[in-house]
């Protein structure tokens, strides 16, 4: 799964609004760092060891599995947007830190 930091997303949208073609569709994603959800959860645990967090995985039942697609990775082609000059700037780990710091700051207010 591709994760894209909100500032990169906004920059991409503005890039399309200013320089994109009217009838074109543009894929916006940070495909440089695809992660599985479990890896994102573990990264969060690793970033904040002082919190004592733990990731627990469970194997879904056959009924639940039927609701999931069988393929693992779908990569969006972002080359059209990149040809306008856009590229993601914030890596997943940095974006997670910024997001958590923002939540902490908001809770203190």
Stretches with model-predicted labels:
Residues 1-109:
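C-terminal substrate-binding subdomain of Rossmann-fold SDR/epimerase-dehydratase oxidoreductases
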């Amino acid at each position: 799964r591709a994760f894209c930091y909100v500032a990169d997303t906004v920059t991409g949208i503005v890039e399309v609004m200013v320089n994109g073609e009217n009838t074109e569709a543009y894929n916006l994603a940070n495909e440089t760092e695809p992660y599985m959800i479990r890896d994102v959860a573990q990264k969060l645990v690793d970033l904040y060891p002082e919190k004592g967090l733990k990731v627990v995985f469970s194997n879904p039942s056959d009924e639940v599995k039927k609701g999931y697609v069988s393929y693992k990775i779908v990569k969006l082609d972002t080359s059209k947007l990149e040809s306008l000059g856009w590229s993601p700037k914030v890596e997943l780990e940095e974006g997670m830190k910024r997001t958590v710091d923002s939540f902490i700051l908001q809770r203190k207010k």
